[in-house]
């Protein structure tokens, strides 16, 4: 169903997520949150329900189990983009004269540089970090202790056969437009 696609909305929060949250149903019950769409099954909704319930408090993210790199906007703070990295998924920032870019891989930021003719200072965000960005700068940095799940090794950002090539081709097409 369409509600299972990103971006995902929960109340005032809308976001995107790379990874898998394994305790999503438990968290929705704990926070007395009904799914926005009754037939929705996407695990990412739990991240945004927690963010909505806690007003994007870093400590609340410790309740999430699984792999996570996520970005969201909260209508109560519309000028701020929140970026969070738990475990198992990478999150990269690229700072340039035109602002801050984020992606799951350094390679994606390099594609942005190449096709948008930018120079970015790239860095990987540390696990257990919540960033609040506004007007091209980091407004706040908060730390949290993400829960480790069964496999503590980072999952590859690209997993499906041909996914890398497909993603790069789509990025190049978007950049050329």
Label each PLM-derived region with a short phrase.
Residues 1-177:
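Conserved short alpha-helical segments that host acidic/polar catalytic motifs at enzyme active sites
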